[in-house]
Amino acid sequence: MLKIVTVCGNGIGSSLLLRMKVEAIAKDLGIAVDAESCDSNAAVGKGADLFVTVKEFKDIFPEGTKLCIVKSYTNRKKIEEDLVPVLKEMSGQD
């Protein structure tokens, strides 16, 4: 099971919507995930296999952190374009 954290500025709205999209996409791919949403300040201290966020927050993470930068918090098609290849690679489906 992959531990995924979705990140936005406040950890309430956008990251929650993104978490729900990530869970649905992973389910459609048959990939088990444990996803949570959080704010950008708390995200750095979280342990996760993958952090999913937008480009505005990519620089808060230490080098070597596994990131998936998505173009949208809400548009499933755009999220899939960025996330599906990463999920497949991490789960060994590629």
Q: Where are each of the predicted segments found?
A:
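A short, aliphatic-rich alpha-helical micro-motif
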Residues: 44-45
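Short, hydrophobic beta-strand segments that form beta-sheet elements in well-ordered domains
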Residues: 35, 48-54
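Active-site regions of enzymes building and remodeling cell-envelope glycoconjugates
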Residues: 51, 63-71
